[in-house]
Every structure is written in structure tokens, then in C-alpha cells.
Regions:
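Short conserved beta-strand and strand-loop elements enriched in small hydrophobics
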Residues: 75-85, 131, 160-164, 272-276
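Extracellular structured ligand-interaction cores
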Residues: 26, 91, 159-160, 197-201, ...
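Autoprocessing Asn-cyclization modules and mimics
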Residues: 8-124, 135
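Boundary/junction segments of secreted and surface-exposed precursor proteins
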Residues: 2-41, 141, 213-232, 327-334
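Charged, amphipathic alpha-helical scaffolding segments
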Residues: 173-218, 286-334
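Surface-exposed interaction/gating patches
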Residues: 140-165, 220-284
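Surface-exposed loop/edge segments in extracytoplasmic proteins
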Residues: 87-93, 168-173, 281-286
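Long, low-hydrophobicity ectodomains and other hydrophilic envelope-associated domains
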Residues: 24, 30-57, 157, 171-172, ...
Length: 334
């Protein structure tokens, strides 16, 4: 059973953790918490800049007690999250190298990164927004969440591993025998610094025995941008509480234009769906949206689950959609 602990103050949460006992085999896990903010402040009016290769970047001034250059470390990955204002919930990838070359108080944003939730932004909409600079989660950081520790092996079939979903399937990253290096089949590269974005979860493949996994951090106190793609995609809710499909926004006619909306159908294969990994079965349980655009069911059942807390912070799930929605927002549930 997952364990959630949460300590807060009258203004904002101080700390939280999501803990779960994982058995040998496959188990899903999401990462709903954020690391402590490295910098918080107010965004100013940005100007255009370029990186060292001439690629377009946004140079954003931030009014804060510290400077971005004082907290960014070369070789590490960070993002800027909008915590208040017109663009609340948006996450914009930080170009660290370019940021360190800018004037004091500025950060370079890479809107071309697939991890940025906006590909373009107006200066007026970002100006005066409250923002936070946050470090990304990596495979190495996930490795540090286990007790007892993960056990590596140079034989991928014997090593503890993490499965990451992309491009229509899972890629397995396994821990090598040095218990430091992460590889995937057919590659000699070290993937320990590979980023797991806030909207992603992973499947954990344990071969060395049961372990306790503890994800510690701070609860997100702003809405969460989750851009929807057509087809299958991994997803997280962004929050360390169980939520329902209704809270997730998985109903029709709730705001998006028809070409970006959820699609319901009484035939499961033709309906949008959510697939949640069930470690007890070693497979996914599928839920689908009915033609009324509101009712969520599983195959062979007439029970309506729209208001049931199916989406949990310590689980892995996929979303299947006919339509993309590049402006999908999960509203903060607390």
C-alpha cells in the first residue's frame, strides 16, 4: 500500500513523501512531488537570444533574491515552472549553458525542447508571472529512492531496471554491475543523467528482491500542464493525492474545442481510454470513456467510475486519445 506523508505551514507545504513497497517483478510508479525550489521570483519582459549554435532562445529576467547563474550547475537539467499568473502550470526547459553566459538575473529558455509545454509564448503573457526554477528528475536520482539499494548486473536480464515509455513502446534501462552506470540494450552510453519529465512515470523491474521506494519532495501548489498527444502517451497527474477521471478533466465538453476534446464511444476500441498498470496481474487494466462523454467503465462492467479515485500518485498509467490537446491543464485538487 502507498504511504503519503505531508507536513505544511499556513502558506505552503514544507515537505511530503510518497512511499511504496515494491515486490519482485514489475511495478509502476509516478513522481508527483517536486524538489525544493532553487529560485522563486517574478518574470519580467523577455528578449530574444540564441545559443552558441545560433538556435533561438528566450532570455527571461527574473526578479529574485538570487540570480539564476548562482544556482544553475553546468551539465545538470532544470526547468522553469510558472506557479502563478496567466501561464500558471506551464513548464519551460532551461538551457543551462546559455543561461550562464547571460547577464545576471536572466535565464535562457528553450521553447524547442520537447519538455517545454509551450512552443511559443508572448512577452505580455509571461511578464509578471510567478516562476520557480526546479531541478529535473533523473535515473540516478530515482536509483537513490530505494531501500535496500537497487542491484546492478552487466547482464541486463539479471539487473534491476527501469522501463520508460516513448515512441509507442517501452525502453529498458538497466543498472550495470558497478551500481552507478545505466545502459540500454545496444548502447554503451551512460544514461544515469537521463531526465524523467514531470508528466512521466516509469515501470520498475526488480530482480534483486522486494524494496521500499520513497519519493520525497514538496507538493505542487500550482495547476499542472499535461499536454495530450494523439495515440498512447505516459501520464502523471502532477499531484500527490488520488484523483478521479473527472478531476483529471477526462470528460467531453469541458472546455477544449471539438478537435482537441476527449472522444467517447460505447465500443471500447473506438473510445479514448486510460490504462493503469496493475502489478498484481503484471498487466494493464483498461478504462474507457462512454459515448455520453462522462461515464468511465471497464470492459464487461456497467459500473460508472467517473468519480472514483483511479489515478494514484504511485502508479504508472497510459492515456489513449484520438485527439491531441496542447493546452490541457489539470487543476490543483487541494
Amino acid at each position: 500500500m502507498p504511504i503519503l506523508s505531508w507536513a505544511d505551514t499556513t502558506t505552503s507545504p514544507a515537505s511530503a513523501s510518497v512511499g511504496k513497497t515494491l515486490t519482485t517483478g514489475l511495478t509502476g510508479f509516478g513522481f508527483p512531488l517536486v524538489e525544493s525550489d532553487l529560485l522563486v521570483g517574478a518574470a519580467g519582459t523577455y528578449t530574444a537570444t540564441t545559443d552558441g549554435s545560433g538556435n533561438a532562445r528566450v532570455s527571461l529576467p527574473i526578479t529574485s533574491v538570487s540570480s539564476p547563474a548562482s544556482i544553475l550547475v553546468s551539465g545538470r537539467a532544470y526547468y522553469l515552472e510558472v506557479t502563478g499568473g496567466l501561464l500558471e502550470g506551464e513548464r519551460l526547459e532551461i538551457d543551462v549553458t546559455t543561461s550562464l553566459a547571460l547577464a545576471s538575473g536572466r535565464v535562457a529558455l528553450d521553447l524547442t525542447s520537447p519538455r517545454s509545454t509551450l512552443a511559443a509564448v508572448s512577452a505580455a503573457s509571461l511578464n509578471a508571472c510567478q516562476v520557480a526554477i526546479r531541478p529535473h528528475l533523473t535515473l540516478a536520482k530515482i536509483q537513490g529512492m530505494f531501500s535496500p539499494a537497487l542491484v546492478g548486473n552487466n547482464n541486463s536480464a539479471l539487473a534491476d531496471a527501469l522501463l520508460v515509455y516513448s515512441a509507442g513502446g517501452f525502453t529498458t534501462y538497466y543498472l550495470r554491475g558497478d551500481n552507478i552506470t545505466w545502459r540500454k540494450a545496444g548502447s554503451t552510453s551512460d544514461f544515469s543523467a537521463m531526465v524523467i519529465a514531470p508528466e512521466e512515470g516509469v515501470l520498475v523491474q526488480l530482480r534483486s528482491g522486494a524494496k521500499v521506494m520513497t519519493h520525497a519532495g514538496v507538493p505542487r501548489m500550482n495547476d499542472f500542464r499535461l499536454n495530450m498527444k494523439a495515440g498512447f502517451m505516459p501520464a502523471c497527474t502532477g499531484f500527490a493525492v488520488d484523483i478521479s477521471p473527472l478531476q483529471f478533466g477526462a470528460v467531453t465538453n469541458a472546455g477544449p474545442a471539438p478537435q482537441n476534446d476527449w472522444v467517447g464511444n460505447n465500443t471500447q476500441a473506438s473510445a479514448d481510454g486510460i490504462q493503469i498498470f496493475d502489478p498484481s496481474k503484471g498487466s494493464f487494466t483498461s478504462y474507457y470513456l462512454r459515448a455520453d462523454g462522462v461515464s468511465w467503465r471497464t470492459a464487461g462492467s456497467t459500473t460508472v467510475l467517473t468519480g472514483s479515485a483511479l489515478l494514484k500518485p504511485d502508479a504508472f498509467f497510459l492515456v489513449k486519445r484520438a485527439n491531441p490537446n496542447p493546452a490541457n491543464l489539470v487543476i490543483r485538487p487541494y
